[in-house]
């Protein structure tokens, strides 16, 4: 979940050239496609279990992971009405010592197994989301050795989890690949998918576009030859609103607070005047003039839905959300509701980012019971 950088000219070039990004015709694999559509029904209302086994490179110890999210949290996810969990997993600790017979870190993998099995026991589908740090992705982007490493890791990981229920265990090739060349990513993704399929013949794969998995990245791709695949994108538009106050990504985000959604003629002028520097003021003025509201969001998500329909493949969006520390609460709920309803209108399953992090549906301290944000639950349409 990062800042997106995108050139419209490059997009147009690849949107045309993308017709040559190869795959066999979808009509050649109707049975597998039907399986993917059927299993996508297990991924309708999801939540991201972030910063547990990924995004915490300084500490993947049992002492931390056992307290960060626990069995009570998994049970709460199911109780709140989520039907699936996207479990983010860093690649590096999987490859570390001590190695088991399968070449994976047996101690770390044992803790992962416990989490996956708890989710399955609570009736939740699980996406095994390979979620490496940018340094790992850089090697994939720039070297053949990095790709070989990724393929081998997935061969081992898929074989390990192929023993679980294939109806409810999904394999996501890589979170936000940060590979800017759509052609290179198409080749990498096809190779990884083939390795997964060899190791796990029955499981459904989740594929994505290059870069940061935005809608425009998805549109550069053609379906894989493998029919048992669900296609994924992420949605955080407009970043001026969803990432206000964030201390990562674009530097100016950290200086913006209280940006309303939707932007109105009455709410924006005074806010823009308070911004001292011209560059940040320009960003806020652009957000205001772009008229982001439920209609604009629906039109944007319709573009992804049209790609899925054209290619006869199921779609999910397994990241969307608003950084909550500096966002106006009601505006945050407005955005979550509008995005969620747009997904559902287009038949697209979703997974909100995230459970207890900066975009969370609960507040929680390590080792303590979670406190549910009932307004988020309501905005997600899960309130009974």
Residue spans of the language-model regions?
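Positively charged n-region of N-terminal signal peptides that target proteins for export
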Residues: 1-4
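Active-site mouth of glycoside hydrolases
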Residues: 28-204, 209-218, 228, 359, ...
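Bacterial N-terminal signal peptides
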Residues: 7-17
């Amino acid at each position: 979940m990062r800042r997106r950088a995108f050139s419209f000219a490059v997009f147009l070039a690849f949107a045309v050239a993308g017709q040559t990004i190869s795959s066999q015709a979808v009509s050649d694999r109707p049975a597998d496609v039907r399986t993917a559509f059927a299993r996508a029904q297990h991924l309708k209302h999801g939540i991201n279990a972030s910063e547990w086994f990924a995004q915490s490179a300084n500490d993947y110890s049992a002492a931390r992971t056992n307290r960060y999210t626990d069995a009570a949290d998994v049970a709460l996810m199911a109780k709140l009405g989520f039907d699936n969990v996207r479990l983010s997993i860093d690649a590096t600790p999987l490859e570390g010592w001590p190695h088991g017979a399968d070449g994976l870190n047996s101690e770390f993998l044992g803790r992962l197994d416990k989490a996956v099995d708890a989710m399955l026991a609570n009736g939740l589908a699980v996406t095994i989301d390979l979620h490496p740090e940018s340094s790992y992705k850089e090697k994939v982007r720039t070297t053949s050795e990095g790709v070989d490493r990724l393929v081998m890791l997935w061969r081992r990981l898929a074989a390990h989890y192929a023993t679980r229920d294939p109806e409810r265990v999904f394999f996501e090739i890589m979170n936000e690949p940060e590979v800017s060349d759509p052609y290179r990513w198409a080749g990498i993704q096809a190779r990884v998918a083939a390795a997964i399929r060899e190791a796990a013949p029955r499981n459904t794969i989740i594929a994505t576009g290059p870069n940061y998995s935005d809608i425009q990245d998805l549109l550069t791709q053609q379906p894989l030859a493998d029919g048992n695949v669900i296609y994924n994108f992420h949605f955080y538009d407009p970043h001026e609103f969803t990432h206000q106050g964030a201390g990562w990504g674009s530097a100016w985000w950290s200086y913006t607070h209280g940006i309303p959604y939707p932007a109105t003629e009455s709410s924006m002028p005074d806010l823009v005047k308070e911004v001292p520097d011209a560059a940040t003021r320009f960003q806020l003025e652009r957000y205001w003039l772009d008229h982001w509201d439920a209609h604009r969001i629906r039109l944007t998500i319709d573009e992804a839905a049209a790609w899925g329909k054209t290619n006869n493949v199921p779609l999910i969006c397994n990241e969307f959300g608003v950084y909550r520390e500096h966002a106006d609460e009601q505006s945050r709920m407005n955005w979550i509701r509008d995005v969620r309803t747009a997904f559902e209108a287009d038949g697209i399953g979703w997974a909100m980012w995230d459970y207890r992090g900066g975009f969370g549906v609960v507040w929680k301290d390590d080792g303590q019971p979670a406190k549910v944000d009932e307004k988020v639950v309501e905005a997600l349409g899960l309130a009974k």
